[in-house]
Amino acid sequence: MMNISEKKRLYTTTELLSIGATYYEIEKMVNAGILYKLDKSVYETVKYSGEESDFYYAMAYAPKGVVCLMSAAVHYGLSTCRPSEVDIAIPRNHKVSTLPEWPPLHVVSFTGDRYSVGIVEQIEDDNKYNIYDIEKTIIDILFYRNKVGIEETKEILINYLGRSDRDLNKLHEYAQKLRCEKILRTYLEILI
């Protein structure tokens, strides 16, 4: 039986096949308790010994998904408000076939630039997930301020402005590209 890395939490069927496993060996590993089948093409490594993250599982159920909104804000340390669901953005023409019981996902459909701008691939050990960069997260929070909440939006923007690694030029560029410039200007005038 082949050796599965204990540093990688989830494998797709394609990844297992690319490292030399056959469908028969995959089924054998499931029966032996080495892998646990989450859905038709995603397997969980039972002997995983790294950090746990809901984001790994979210990507398993939404492969084109990008961590966004409050989940991204918490990831960057911009908010103390912990969301009860993982916020995931997907392209408008894609669907999430099966929503898992855990982690609960809040799926948001984005179109065009709102989806494609600012995607960053995060790698932790052998695990990968996509998340929007901090400036794109700020613009999305401002755009969805009525759903996120005005107080949370204010807290996130204040925390961003207090960071030494903030990039106001990039923030302004994203605001222009995503038609959120007027909202950003209003919030900055109030806070500064």
Annotated model-derived regions:
Residues 1-3:
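Amphipathic, charged-and-aliphatic alpha-helical interface segments
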Residues 5-18, 25, 30-32, 38, ...:
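Nucleic-acid-binding surface
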